[in-house]
Amino acid sequence: QLSPMAQQTKETLGTKDLTVLADRGYFSGEEILKCEQAQIKALVPKPMTSNSTSSGRFDKRDFHYEAKRDRYRCPAGKYATRRCTSIQHGMTIHRYWSTACPQCPLRSACTTDTCRRINRWEHEDVVERMQRRIDGMPQAGRLRRQTVEHTFGTLKSWMGATHFLTRTLPRVRTEMSLQVLAYNLKRVMQILGVQPLI
């Protein structure tokens, strides 16, 4: 859903460089990969769904990936190497673990199993690059919330509890377009005043 909207925006604006900000609900590794292939910089925070973190154990982010050797270094300084590869939901996933886990003094802070297994998508580097961009632009999320959330809150308030009065996608699109047009006109009148529009 993210990449088609981003590509359409890029075409509409007629620009070569485009940075797309979206909230966690739009996170999809495959969509972020499609954006990068279309030379669109996506900034979509990764959802925090790790059971380890909520249980107070080490998260995947605590393991450092060494691309040259294709292995992870754990918080104890041991290495988890690639053991197998599988296809999950159409994505190639590599699995890593270490033989040092059963004797590790940090095991209880890492896993409840005999060893910690780490999954890595074949295009995980795309997601990691995006995360570095997000880390380098902490104001981006704040800017998105200021510009987008207020607008949607206002539109939802105007539209009321039923939201759309029409049915079928073409009619709903038309209704939404009219709502957005009304919002934009109101903003222009607040900023410029009514006189320049007459």
Locations of regions flagged by a protein language model:
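Anion-binding and metal-coordination hotspots
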Residues: Q1-I198
